[in-house]
Amino acid sequence: LAHGAPHSALAATFVAQGIAVVSVSDNLADVLALLDIQDRALARKVPVIVGAACSPGMTGLLVHHVTRAFDSIDEVHVAVHGTGGPQCARQHHDSLAGVSIGWHEGEWLQRPAGSGRELCWFPDPVGARDCYRFASPEPVLLQRIAPSLQRITARVSATRRDRLTARLPML
């Protein structure tokens, strides 16, 4: 399913018909619903792959690779910059208005999205950007990949205007 969220309703229909599903959704609520469907699909032996894009997706592959390359890893922090089109921009906008989740010492923490400014460095030409918590499924999916992690966070670059207008409808 390579379209804007939500994917869960269509995925449930496909699973009921025995059709495998691969989702690129990066919407937190949608991914949580897809994970519920995935658990039911396993009983029917229908594959459901959640988080098959860049973020989430490629990040999970990198974490899996790194956990095999090092003796131990305690923390993973993901930072994202930029958008790739109108749907992506809308998701970026909406994700700053919701609730952010993070994994901390074996517990799920919920914090307001758009809070917790942290300076993150990206490769040139992007450079340093202020990044904030956002409603991302990354911590949920990464915790499933590497349950031994103690801390998992996800942040997105945003301007003051992004944060100020996040709770308003996107035009």
Label each PLM-derived region with a short phrase.
Residues 13-14, 41:
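Generic structural signal for hydrophobic
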Residues 17-20, 44-46:
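A short helix->loop->beta-strand "cap" motif at the edges of active sites that frequently abuts
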Residues 25-48:
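Rossmann-fold NAD(P)-binding glycine/threonine-rich loop
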Residues 68-171:
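C-terminal catalytic/substrate-binding lobe primarily of soluble NAD(P)-dependent oxidoreductases
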